[in-house]
Amino acid sequence: THRMAREIREELEKQNFHVVELRMCELRDSDLRDELELADLVLVGTSTINRDAPPQAWHAMSLFSLVTPKAKIAAAFGSFGWSGEAVKLVEERLKGLRFKMPVPGLTLRFSPTDDNLRECREFAGQVAAQVVGTE
């Protein structure tokens, strides 16, 4: 998932987006909340562990309800080994919080191949187009 995030971030930066990458396991709640308030776009990357997103992802997402999602676009992506449910679960949570979700989540099995990294760049381009379309 980290390689996916790096590829997505680099593609967004090529398109002149200011990207703040936050690692949920290393973040204070107040810092996450502050960054969410400033963001036009929220991308959540998560792996699937035991058919779910890890606890750190759910804790971070619990803070999303403190943010007004008006006009905020969100999307999810992640890697999995066997089942891959985490991205869909995260998408459901984001939709429930009323984030706009115009681009389907991206899931990749195991470590990304060169073709998968291309998919990550395409995903970033699709999300970027949605943000640009709302400005």
Give the predicted meaning of each segment:
Residues 1-3:
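Glycine-rich phosphate/diphosphate-binding loop of Rossmann-like nucleotide-binding domains
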Residues 6-25, 32-135:
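FMN-binding flavodoxin-like domain, especially the glycine-rich phosphate-binding loop
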